[in-house]
Amino acid sequence: MKQSMVFSPTLREVPADAEIKSHQLLLRAGFMRQNASGIYSFLPLGLKVLHKVEHIIREEMERAGAVELLMPALQAAELWQESGRWYSYGSELMRMKDRNDREFALGATHEEVITDLVRDEIKSYKKLPLTLYQIQTKFRDEQRPRFGLLRGREFLMKDAYSFHATQESLDEVYDRLFQAYSNIFARCGLNFRAVIADSGAMGGKDTHEFMVLSDVGEDTIAYSDTSDYAANIEMAPVVATYTKSDEAEKALEKVATPDQKAIEEVSAFLNIEPSQCIKTMVFKVDEKFVVVLVRGDHEVNDVKVKNVYGASVVELASYEEVRSLLNCEVGSLGPIGIAEDVEVIADHAVAAIVNGCCGANEEGFHYVNVNSERDFKVNQYADLRFIQEGDQSPDGKGTIRFARGIEVGHVFKLGTRYSEAMNATFLDENGKTKPLIMGCYGIGVSRTVAAIAEQFNDENGLVWPKAVAPFHVHVIPVNMKSDVQREVAENIYTSLQEQGYEVLLDDRTERAGVKFADADLFGLPVRVTVGKKADEGIVEVKVRATNESAEVKVEDLHTYIADILK
């Protein structure tokens, strides 16, 4: 393709609202433009990268036995109401009404639609297993869209759904698609980890996320420093054991702590370690209020709280709700004196605290010499805290370290979560009616483009891996007014295309500095510069990833480039 025909408006300055490298460079290189907050147009070069990623996905999905279809983005509310998610999914679901006052949603995901489709067609075990996938636009009303394509309100996603008669069949397909995902991200050139994850609003149980390692990732990965264990920090269990000291229990005492509210402030004021404090928080678990206790140097993991109760929604209670429930302010909360009808759950570490400290449920006062069971009730002990760096790895091998990650893929074993809710059944080989067993497998396609850009860049621009680069080779005649340079460049352009390479020819009459700056921004794997030595049959070849360059005879160019791109 000739560059004069490509719509690729470049920017010399970093856009003010672009916080991370991928967002900055995709805008500066003219790969995309913002239409509204969290909504982007893919320009020609960006679309070519997107299509390359889609092609890799399609190849691996079909190799894994999945068949492509396309479902509507606009979905009837009745299906979401049938599954129970119309009300539980939250404000991220974009809802609307048509002229007849019928409710719809713009699809954030397609479990309901695919289940409705399959339940009307698949009635016998003889038609199972079945795996279907689509690449479709999704919509989520993000409260704060940010980081360009990483957190938008409209995005492209590949979602696959598998249907089974047995759990063994689901396990087999899950493993196959897990491997397909590993192949996809490896072919895209990404440095990634597959980690144990939480199913969130999707439901189901066994699930893994595919995380691209990046300092700008919004997720934290907890991994072992000696084994292959890796999990989203939300899902990493704490296997530490806590032993009570043999210190004698002291008499409970109420002390004044004026203007001391945070754990750090209280522990410093009382000259004790934060680990001697009991942190008290109130959560709304579905429609029920629960008091949660953890050690002062630990943080409550709300996903673990959710899993204790099998709840759909867990959120921190508001100041007003805490005031109404416990008749005190948030900075003074403690478990002593809480009404019997209020449930209290505590992390295992709390049971080992001897002569600790907690809020007195009274502004400006705390209790010291606090001991569980003697001074307050606990309805249940459980693992309720986030794992920390330095904790023992859950697999017993090594200690935990943290890394940041961008989630680009997620696979779930949904089980019968949707089929039971929506009465999607089949007849088994004994003629008995059973709910379909389901799996779900998603890839953020546009997000993957951003993740690649985030991992592959330098101070001058993008550095695309060859598998997803919009073109393989960038041919740049320094001076288009030179008949020799123009003719050599066009001959190279034509011959490389005949060899099967995708080639971009910069046929513009811009200054050389502008051409080179744009070439660095575009980040194509190989640059061929046709300059003053063109009349000698010599050109310069530069490898974008390493910035290494060499003078090469035109007759040797095909072999030289083939060696670079092999």
Curated annotation (Swiss-Prot):
It is found in: Cytoplasm. Gene3D superfamilies: Anticodon-binding domain, Bira Bifunctional Protein, Domain 2. Keywords: Aminoacyl-tRNA synthetase, ATP-binding, Cytoplasm, Ligase, Nucleotide-binding, Protein biosynthesis. Its main location: cytoplasm. One of its GO terms (cellular component) is cytosol. It catalyses: tRNA(Pro) + L-proline + ATP = L-prolyl-tRNA(Pro) + AMP + diphosphate. GO terms for molecular function: aminoacyl-tRNA deacylase activity; ATP binding; catalytic activity, acting on a protein; proline-tRNA ligase activity; transferase activity. Its EC number is 6.1.1.15. SUPFAM superfamilies: Class II aaRS ABD-related (SSF52954), Class II aaRS and biotin synthetases (SSF55681), YbaK/ProRS associated domain (SSF55826). One of its GO terms (biological process) is prolyl-tRNA aminoacylation. Catalyzes the attachment of proline to tRNA(Pro) in a two-step reaction: proline is first activated by ATP to form Pro-AMP and then transferred to the acceptor end of tRNA(Pro). As ProRS can inadvertently accommodate and process non-cognate amino acids such as alanine and cysteine, to avoid such errors it has two additional distinct editing activities against alanine. One activity is designated as 'pretransfer' editing and involves the tRNA(Pro)-independent hydrolysis of activated Ala-AMP. HAMAP family: Pro_tRNA_synth_type1. Consists of three domains: the N-terminal catalytic domain, the editing domain and the C-terminal anticodon-binding domain. Belongs to the class-II aminoacyl-tRNA synthetase family. ProS type 1 subfamily. Homodimer. This is Proline--tRNA ligase. It comes from Bacillus cytotoxicus (strain DSM 22905 / CIP 110041 / 391-98 / NVH 391-98). The gene is proS.
